[in-house]
């Protein structure tokens, strides 16, 4: 009987890891709590296939504690499941866990892990994050985008009104708004290639599950080839790269003369980045390449579309299931806006209850239930135990956000829990860190949440909503689908009716 090439490789891999298992030296150091493991594949891998990893890991943490070690393939992972331990890791030991693992998806889709999300910790990342904070996504810059946001909101509201009385998929409407807003803010116009970029964003998200088998056995270099992941990502990158190259090349021709002198002021993010490419940035010593720019523009679009749409979709889902919350939020928006034609950025500060709705929604439905993993740069001690270099640190934020030791009625949807509370999601309150904390906190929180609040306020102001087919609120399913983030398994479909108050 013939044995296939794939089977031969699999058998050789098993023999190799059995040998490593038998010959590795025994540690005399105090060990972190861990569950019993299977040979070679280690812990939980078999449990996570086709499941929701954040829920599997929370169940294990309930048994083994908030700091838990898992051996998954070759990967040594430390899973953190409480606010106080997350604070200890990300604050006390922040520099030591400031690296990112170099995953297969990041290496290919982000031009060898360029950009702020997956770049190795060092001078490049520090400089890039400074540009994000002071130029690309500063509060002043975000305010300058309000006009763009309001313009695109008006277009979206008109589109929804045209379908009033008919079931619509809310996610599709939001994605069009977010893509067009991101493109105008990033590159100055609604660029060609919308469908390619949206398709690439969805594909990248679907392929970016927090833990992929290709990354669990890094010594088996052929694994991404056997699985087909490398081919899928390479083909996807080719399509994406064509669109990004055209956008950047066209803009650069308009910005610079033949002798490299700027012809126009930078009015958007791409303009700022091109100044740095051509040595005309605020720090003339810091230069970036076309690949840097493509990675940055792509991560801005990727992070600013799908995650924001998912947050609003969960907000609307929870309000449909909780009509009391829906009415209270609508009453606030309609009272604040009164007879205005549309929601504006300047209105958001007055929408206190809407902000509570967003906080409560990201607590229960975070855009990334497992925060992007960190990689340990040097051994360090925690709780009398050694956290080894090269381990992954995974913050199970979903476990933190539903921890009954921190939250009263932890699984109940209750925005009022944030009334008269100073807790926010900007990285200082570790019970609410859906966007991360410490040296790798998401640099685009303000931009993203501004879009989320504008979308939500527009839906609440202009429309009343109901489920199709006479479905009752309590019948709406809340099933999750796990990828780079956690979205609804079944997209939210609602029937809008035009509100007299909002029109």
UniProtKB/Swiss-Prot annotation:
Disulfide bridge map: none
Subcellular location: Endoplasmic reticulum membrane
Transmembrane segments: 3-23
Entry EC number(s): 1.14.19.81
Keyword annotations from UniProtKB, A to Z: Alkaloid metabolism, Endoplasmic reticulum, Heme, Iron, Membrane, Metal-binding, Monooxygenase, Oxidoreductase, Signal-anchor, Transmembrane, Transmembrane helix
Swiss-Prot/TrEMBL cofactor(s): heme
GO terms for biological process, alphabetical: alkaloid biosynthetic process
Keyword rRNA processing annotated: no
Binding site for heme: 442
Pathway per the UniProt entry: Alkaloid biosynthesis; ajmaline biosynthesis
One function term, GO molecular function aspect: heme binding
Top-level division of the source organism's lineage: Eukaryota
InterPro entries assigned to the protein according to its UniProt record, in alphabetical order: Cyt_P450, Cyt_P450_CS, Cyt_P450_E_grp-I, Cyt_P450_sf
Function per UniProt: Monooxygenase involved in the biosynthesis of ajmaline-type monoterpenoid indole alkaloids (MIAs) natural products, important plant-derived pharmaceuticals used in the therapy of heart disorders. Converts by cyclization the strictosidine-derived geissoschizine to the sarpagan alkaloid polyneuridine aldehyde, precursor of vomilenine, an intermediate chemical in the biosynthesis of ajmaline. Converts by aromatization the tetrahydro-beta-carboline alkaloids tetrahydroalstonine and ajmalicine to the corresponding beta-carboline alkaloids alstonine and serpentine, respectively.
Family the UniProt entry places it in: Belongs to the cytochrome P450 family.
Protein name: Sarpagan bridge enzyme 1
Organism: Rauvolfia serpentina (Serpentine wood)
Organism placement in taxonomy: Eukaryota, Viridiplantae, Streptophyta, Embryophyta, Tracheophyta
């Amino acid at each position: 009987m013939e044995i296939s090439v794939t089977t031969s490789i699999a058998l050789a891999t098993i023999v190799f890891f059995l040998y490593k298992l038998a010959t590795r030296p025994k540690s005399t150091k105090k060990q972190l709590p861990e569950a019993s493991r299977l040979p070679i594949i280690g812990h939980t891998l078999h449990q996570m296939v086709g499941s929701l990893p954040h829920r599997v890991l929370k169940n294990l943490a309930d048994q083994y504690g908030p700091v838990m070690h898992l051996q998954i393939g070759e990967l040594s992972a430390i899973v953190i499941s409480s606010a106080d331990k997350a604070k200890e890791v990300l604050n006390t030991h922040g520099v030591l866990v400031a690296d990112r693992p170099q995953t297969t998806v990041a290496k290919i889709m982000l031009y060898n892990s360029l950009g702020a999300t997956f770049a190795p910790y060092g001078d490049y990342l520090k400089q890039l994050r400074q540009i994000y904070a002071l130029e690309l996504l500063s509060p002043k810059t975000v305010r300058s985008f309000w006009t763009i946001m309001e313009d695109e909101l008006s277009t979206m509201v008109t589109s929804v009104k045209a379908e009033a009385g008919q079931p619509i998929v809310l996610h599709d409407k939001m994605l069009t708004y977010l893509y067009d807003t991101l493109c105008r803010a990033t590159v100055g116009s609604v660029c060609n290639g919308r469908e390619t970029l949206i398709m690439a964003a969805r594909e990248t998200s679907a392929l970016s599950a927090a833990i992929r088998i290709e990354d669990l056995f890094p010594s088996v270099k052929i694994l991404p080839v056997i699985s087909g992941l490398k081919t899928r990502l390479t083909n996807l990158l080719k399509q994406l790269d064509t669109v990004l190259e055209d956008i950047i090349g066209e803009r650069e021709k308009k910005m610079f003369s033949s002798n490299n002198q700027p012809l126009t002021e930078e009015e958007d993010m791409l303009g700022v980045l091109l100044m740095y490419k051509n040595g005309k940035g605020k720090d003339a010593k810091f230069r970036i390449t076309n690949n840097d720019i493509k990675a940055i523009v792509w991560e801005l679009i990727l992070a600013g579309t799908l995650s924001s749409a998912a947050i609003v979709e969960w907000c609307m889902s929870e309000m449909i299931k909780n009509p009391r919350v829906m009415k209270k939020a609508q009453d606030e928006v309609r009272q604040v806006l009164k007879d205005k034609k549309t929601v504006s950025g300047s209105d958001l500060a007055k929408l206190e209850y809407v902000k509570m709705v967003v906080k409560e929604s990201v607590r229960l439905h975070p855009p990334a239930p497992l925060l992007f993993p960190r990689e340990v740069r040097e051994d360090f001690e925690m709780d009398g135990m050694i956290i080894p270099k090269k381990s992954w640190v995974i913050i199970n934020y979903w476990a933190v956000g539903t921890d009954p030791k921190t939250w009263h009625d932890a699984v109940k949807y209750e925005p009022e829990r944030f009334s008269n509370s100073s807790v926010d999601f900007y990285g200082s309150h570790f019970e609410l860190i859906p966007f991360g904390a410490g040296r790798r906190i998401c640099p685009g929180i303000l931009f993203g949440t501004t879009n989320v609040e504008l979308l939500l306020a527009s839906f609440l102001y202009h429309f009343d909503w109901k489920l199709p087919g006479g479905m009752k609120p309590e019948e709406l399913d809340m099933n999750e689908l796990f990828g780079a983030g956690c979205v609804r398994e079944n997209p939210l479909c609602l029937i809008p009716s035009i509100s007299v108050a909002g029109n």
